[in-house]
Amino acid sequence: MVVNVGLIGYGNQAKRLEKFFSRNKTVLKSIYHPKKASKNFTNNLEDLYSNDCIFITSPNHTHFEYLKRLTNDFSGYIFCEKPPIINEDELIFLKNLPDQKKQKIFFD
């Protein structure tokens, strides 16, 4: 089974994941970066929504905003680097998500 993956961000962790994916039955289909748009990158987050899962590897302070947006708009699996949140309000938001959404969110 081939898994289509999208990445948010393209720092060190994303580059490590890219190498890992290339050695497994995973297709890195798209990479989102808010300031880059080219053949390999998109600056439109919705371009990632056709993937089976999305990895959030962006800077720490952006994790929650991406989690919030993806839990509203994306139906696949979400893998988020730590820390996923930076305050209690963000924790409460994640805690109050429906169980169906929580079952598709994973943290590293």
What are these regions (language model features)?
Residues N40-N44:
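Short acidic-hydrophobic, aromatic-tinged amphipathic segments that line or gate anion-handling sites
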Residues M1-K39, Y49:
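N-terminal Rossmann-like dinucleotide-binding module
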Residues M1, E46-S50, T71-D73:
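Flexible, charged surface loops at secondary-structure boundaries
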Residues C53-I56, F64-D108:
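Beta-strand-loop-alpha-helix segment that lines the small-molecule cofactor/substrate pocket
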Residues P59:
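Aromatic "clamp/platform" in nucleotide-sugar-dependent glycosyltransferases that forms part
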